[in-house]
Amino acid sequence: MVYSVGLTGNIASGKSTVAEFFSELGINVIYADKIAKELTSKNTPCYQDIISHFGSSVVLNNGELDRKRIRDIIFSNSNERLWLESLLHPVIRKKIEEQLIVCTSPYCLIEIPLLFNKHHYPYLQKVLLVIAPLESQLDRIVKRDHCTKKQALAILATQPNLEQRLEAADDVLINESGLSELKAKVNKLHQKYLREAKIKQ
């Protein structure tokens, strides 16, 4: 199977921008969140399981899942979050594996927001962690989700702590300056992963 790098980091750390930069360099990127959205779209098995568990209050008028409502539930109740993760993670892992088989770039990048245990993804050779200063994260969450700073802090509080993240990480990318510096760091890592992928072959 192709050499693969797991890209992770807390919410609003700049993961998506980093993934875009790798994509511009010709690297295939797999998005776990996108897979999760497809797996929970209307009338899928996971969709039915979620409604059976949470009830009709998580369904919008058009029949789609009310993702904001579900997010509010799991951010305020760790047991509900664990239930949802146990439902989705095994099927997400399987879908990622299927996409890795058809990867055409020298290595593949997999964006997995909640990756803090590499053993759950045995096909990963490396884990790249993106870190951003707390204030930057808060600003991004407030702007993106149109929420208060207090709500943004509550969202961040549900994320794995930095120690857990660092324990799983092989490489750490600190996103604290402008885009040009971030791009330069990505280019450097790209060269490193190209070399490592070549050795693996």
From Swiss-Prot:
Record-annotated DPCK domain positions: 4-201
Claim: Ubl conjugation is one of the keywords in the record: no
Molecular function GO labels: ATP binding; dephospho-CoA kinase activity
Protein residues bound to ATP: 12-17
Annotated SUPFAM superfamilies: P-loop containing nucleoside triphosphate hydrolases (SSF52540)
PROSITE patterns in UniProt: DPCK (PS51219)
Keyword annotations from UniProtKB, A to Z: ATP-binding, Coenzyme A biosynthesis, Cytoplasm, Kinase, Nucleotide-binding, Transferase
CDD domains assigned to the protein according to its UniProt record, in alphabetical order: DPCK
Enzyme superclass (EC): transferase
Primary localization: cytoplasm
Classification via InterPro entries: Depp_CoAkinase, P-loop_NTPase
Disulfide bonds: none
Subcellular location field: Cytoplasm
E.C. number: 2.7.1.24
Catalyzed reaction equations: 3'-dephospho-CoA + ATP = ADP + CoA + H(+)
Pathway: Cofactor biosynthesis; coenzyme A biosynthesis; CoA from (R)-pantothenate: step 5/5
Gene Ontology annotations for the cellular component aspect, listed alphabetically: cytoplasm
A GO biological-process term: coenzyme A biosynthetic process
Record function comment: Catalyzes the phosphorylation of the 3'-hydroxyl group of dephosphocoenzyme A to form coenzyme A.
PANTHER family: BIFUNCTIONAL COENZYME A SYNTHASE-RELATED (PTHR10695:SF46), DEPHOSPHO-COA KINASE-RELATED (PTHR10695)
Family annotation (HAMAP family): Dephospho_CoA_kinase
Assigned protein family: Belongs to the CoaE family.
Protein name: Dephospho-CoA kinase
Source species: Legionella pneumophila subsp. pneumophila (strain Philadelphia 1 / ATCC 33152 / DSM 7513)
Underlying gene: coaE
